[in-house]
């Protein structure tokens, strides 16, 4: 299936000169969504990834993460922006192009030695995925892989990530 044909291009968003890859059209396509989820699971199986948890980054990692976790017989754990999780959290602050941001995970969600696959819809510069990996590594987790629907190759986000397989279905 040609998944690229199911992704809408939005020029000059969020600012001039940026071509935004909108996956909402893929999400709205039943066969495309099924194919995407099956292909993500297959990528993980072929890479022999056997996580204890799939960690989804806010917010589109929440769309793909639970189904991926279910199919890999793993738990699903969300990583959120500040103030969204109500129990005690671990936090990490990371640099953005213009400032900083923070990510949080419940303290009781993962533990030292847990094998983790991190999932999101898209990797561009890799900043959020790197911060998520740093947060989990600080806890003592073992990052065994990263899974993305879309990878923007020219931004070289995978080069910023720790040494673990980086799997993506669609590359631009």
From Swiss-Prot:
Top-level taxonomic group: Bacteria
GO cellular component: cytoplasm
GO function term, MF aspect, one: adenine phosphoribosyltransferase activity
SUPFAM superfamilies in UniProt: PRTase-like
Catalytic class of the enzyme: transferase
Keyword hit for Secreted: no
Pathway stated in the Swiss-Prot or TrEMBL entry: Purine metabolism; AMP biosynthesis via salvage pathway; AMP from adenine: step 1/1
Reaction catalysed by this enzyme: AMP + diphosphate = 5-phospho-alpha-D-ribose 1-diphosphate + adenine
GO biological process: adenine salvage; AMP salvage; purine ribonucleoside salvage
Enzyme Commission code(s) on record: 2.4.2.7
Flavoprotein in keyword set: no
Subcellular localization: Cytoplasm
Record keywords, A-Z: Cytoplasm, Glycosyltransferase, Purine salvage, Transferase
Family named by the database record: Belongs to the purine/pyrimidine phosphoribosyltransferase family.
Chain's role: Catalyzes a salvage reaction resulting in the formation of AMP, that is energically less costly than de novo synthesis.
Quaternary structure and partners: Homodimer.
PANTHER family hit by this protein: ADENINE PHOSPHORIBOSYLTRANSFERASE
Official protein name in the record: Adenine phosphoribosyltransferase
Protein's organism: Picosynechococcus sp. (strain ATCC 27264 / PCC 7002 / PR-6) (Agmenellum quadruplicatum)
Gene assigned in the entry: apt
């Amino acid at each position: 299936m040609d998944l690229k044909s199911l992704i809408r291009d939005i020029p000059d968003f969020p600012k001039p000169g940026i071509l935004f890859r909108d996956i909402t059209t893929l999400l709205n396509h039943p066969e495309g969504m099924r194919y995407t989820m099956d292909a993500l699971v297959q990528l993980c199986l072929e890479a022999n990834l056997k996580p204890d948890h799939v960690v989804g980054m806010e917010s589109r990692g929440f769309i793909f993460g639970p189904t991926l976790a279910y199919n890999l017989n793993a738990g699903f754990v969300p990583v959120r922006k500040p103030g969204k999780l109500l129990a005690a959290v671990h936090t990490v602050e990371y640099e953005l192009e213009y400032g900083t941001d923070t990510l949080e995970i419940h303290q009781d969600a993962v533990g030292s030695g847990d094998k983790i696959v991190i999932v999101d819809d898209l990797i561009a510069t890799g900043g959020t995925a790197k911060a998520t990996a740093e947060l989990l590594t600080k806890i003592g987790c073992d990052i065994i892989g990263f899974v993305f629907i879309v990878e923007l190759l020219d931004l070289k986000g995978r080069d910023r990530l720790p040494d673990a397989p980086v799997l993506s279905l669609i590359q631009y």
